[in-house]
Structures are given as C-alpha cells and as structure tokens.
C-alpha cells in the first residue's frame, strides 16, 4: 500500500518527511515564545470560503522546563488551555522511546529541553495522521 503525501522540508534542526495528501499548499514558518519555551512552527493551510484553515502544524519546542514527557504534556495543556488530568492521551512508539497522542495531536520529548508537537485538523484527516507525521520527523545531524 502506498501512502500518499509529500515531503515537509526542514524545520529548526528536524526534517518533516511526510505531509498528508490534501494538506494545504500555503506553508508558513513562525517563531514565537510562551512561558519561556521557544516555538519554531510550520503551518500548512488552505483557502476556504471565509478565509484560511490550518490543516497541519508542527512545532519544535525548546526550553529548560521541558525535561520529561509529563512536563511536556503539562506545558502543552497550559498552552492549549486544557486540564492535563482530563486530557485523554495514549502512548505511541517513537524510535526507542514513546510519545503521547490524542485528538489529532502527537508529541514527544527528543531530549531534555527539546520536544516536537504535531497537530492535524481532525475534520480533514484521521486523528492517526498526527502519529504518521510524527513518525516521519527526524532530527538532522549537526553541522
């Protein structure tokens, strides 16, 4: 079976190896910071009748407070204004480690201080697409 999609390019030291077919062609990169964590973000969006709709977001997160997967979860819960205790997440395999996924979002701790977060529009794609995108992301070699 061939999974249709395209390459997502490089973002802040990572390569996004797969973007689902049907993700918008308008691609934008952003840099931001929230609660002492820096975000390097790439967004795929498409034009809709009343403006634009985001289909896929990939965030590379850097910050001293991101030392464990549970701390990444708590940080993202605050960022998304969710109660981390009420956020239904499940583990997914990520190389020799695990990440957490739920509701079209997949994230993992690369190492202390560095995490990656993937979000897909669940009205456009199956929630599992976030895991497929996450599984395609590789850290680039230094230098």
Regions found by a protein language model. Name each.
Residues 1-112:
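Short, solvent-exposed recognition patches
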Residues 114-143:
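Surface-exposed amphipathic alpha-helical segments
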């Amino acid at each position: 079976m061939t999974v249709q999609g395209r390459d997502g390019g490089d973002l802040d030291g990572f390569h996004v190896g797969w973007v689902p077919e049907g993700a918008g062609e308008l691609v934008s990169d952003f840099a931001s910071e929230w609660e002492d964590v820096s975000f390097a973000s790439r967004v795929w969006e498409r034009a809709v009748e009343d403006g634009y709709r985001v289909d896929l977001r990939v965030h590379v997160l850097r910050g001293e407070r991101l030392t464990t997967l549970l701390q990444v979860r708590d940080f993202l819960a605050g960022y998304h204004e969710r109660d981390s205790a009420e956020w239904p997440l499940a583990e997914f395999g990520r190389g020799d480690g695990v990440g957490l996924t739920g509701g079209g979002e997949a994230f993992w701790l690369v190492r202390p201080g560095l995490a990656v977060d993937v979000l897909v529009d669940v009205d456009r794609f199956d929630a599992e697409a976030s895991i497929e995108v996450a599984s395609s992301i590789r850290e680039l070699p230094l230098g």
